[in-house]
């Protein structure tokens, strides 16, 4: 669900979110569990296709940059587009989002480390951005040395990360309960606290796992290939509507 949110924000399939609430479909998710429970591997596996997509964009950017330099740096300088960010400042986050208006995702393994500097070094600027983005409000940032601000009319910022069970309470001591951030976070805990045992792949399980990973990559690839906008001069989100039968099926589910 979270990966689809990352791929679909500000793209055709966000229609249901707008129809219900008028907001985007961003998700803030924290996986909670004791150390060694295996929180990170499934998260990385789920995001592998998106990271692969980002890497392809990076290689294309490298090629375009070399061509631009070879041409005497004439014309518009190429811009790197990416979806996943992990190490960032509030300003760089919005600059990344401006380059990729479809959506960005903050993917942090131990997410408590992200919240600590938010209050100490940026006076809560990051938190304010996240609260505004969640509500669908526009975001602006003025780059250092530039008088032209970056304006994001329809921000779509996702958050996903992990933390240890004993550290969840730290969010309550940082004022996030009062400003409403906690109400926007989905905390996910495992049904079982036992670590799965090693599996013998002699029964063909390895092939099934590879097929599942390939199928997952194919699904996300189709979603990422959807058009973002319909406007030529302005970035206008392209929205598809459900027909009556689809709506009835969804709400019955």
Q: Model-flagged regions — what are they?
A:
Residues 1-253:
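Phosphate-handling catalytic cores of nucleic-acid transaction enzymes
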